[in-house]
């Protein structure tokens, strides 16, 4: 594991701990979050996914905030919940939830097909089995 990967994972776990979210990410999950961050910022250069792109801000405002659902649903890590993320945008909170809680069954929907295509590519890399992505217009 490179020093950059280690630092990213440490910063992410620190943000989760500071929010008192009862989750300890595995090294593999931390690597997946970093890979998603890299894909997000690269894709954001050609497709408007998010205005938040600085690493520490993404860790706090996208990743840790998404995982904070655990505070409202304390047994989130103990049951195979089904979650529908309508208007997912760049995949928040759905993608971070899927990485942190692989047993969740997620459906992500967004009105822009190009965002759904980005999310589907990410799903194929990591947690495709329990995540479905659909274009949706309300």
Where are these regions (language model features)?
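N-terminal auxiliary segments of SAM/dcSAM-dependent transferases
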Residues: 1-54
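A generic "alpha-helical surface" signal
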Residues: 31, 57-60, 110
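SAM-dependent Rossmann-like transferase core, predominantly class I methyltransferases
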Residues: 49-77
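Conserved SAM/SAH cofactor-binding pocket of Class I
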Residues: 67-138
